[in-house]
Every structure is written in C-alpha cells, then in structure tokens.
Amino acid sequence: MKKKIAIIGAGVAGLTLANFIKKYTDHEFMVYEREESLSLEEGYGIQLGANSIKILNEINFNKINNEKVFHPSTIDFYNIQNEKICDLNLSKYNSIDAKYTTLQRSTLIEFLKENIYT
C-alpha cells in the first residue's frame, strides 16, 4: 500500500523533499503552500556548499543552465568598518562535479518545482 505524504511548505526544503520522495519512493505526496503562487522574485541570493550540490545533483541539479549559477573561487570577509579580515579559497572544497555555488533563490525554486513534474 502506497503511503500518502503531506509536505507543508513549497520553499527550498519542501520542494527538495518532494523531489527525493519522487525519485526514491513510490509514495504519493502533495505539497501544500499557504500562498497562492510561489514567489519567484529576482534578487534573493543563496549560497550552496559543495556537499549541498552533491545532494542536489542526485535530482539533476548538474543539468541546470550554467548561465544561472556562479562558482566563486574565493570568499572575502569584511568587518563592519568594511575592512577585509580574510578570504577563503573555495577551490580546495570543490570537486569536479560539486562546486561551491551561488544563485538566485528563485532559480533554485524554479528548478525544484519543474523537476517534480518531469
């Protein structure tokens, strides 16, 4: 008997969960969101470490349009007086198939949403 799963919230976590349920189980699921539509406003940036990318690649994140993501090589840290404190070389944490990634939250949400229905 198939289990029925309710996922509350169509944010990054809820849509990621839905993608993994779809890929690895035969359970039925429904994603519930209190808003009438998903907010795909531009402007909110997120950062995903290499380990996050490895997980997302299991649901084909590696096939996302490369023009929509950025793979910085370093991160600079500044104090409140805008003085550089240090930098972090990200290349030593990257692998060929999983790199530190920045992108707009809307790009990730759109990918996760579309991936559920393909």
Residue ranges of each PLM-predicted region?
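A detector of helix-start/N-cap boundary segments at the beginnings of structured domains
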Residues: E41-G43, A98-K99
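Short, solvent-exposed loop/turn segments at secondary-structure junctions
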Residues: V12-A13, E36-S37, I53
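Beta1/beta-strand and adjacent pyrophosphate-binding region of the FAD-binding site
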Residues: M1-A13
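Glycine-rich FAD pyrophosphate-binding loop
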Residues: F20-E42
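Active-site loop of classical SDR/Rossmann-like NAD(P)-dependent oxidoreductases
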Residues: Y44-L48
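Conserved N-terminal helical subregion
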Residues: K2-I5, K22, G49-T118
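Hydrolases whose catalytic domains are alpha/beta-hydrolase-1, hotdog thioesterase
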Residues: T16-L17
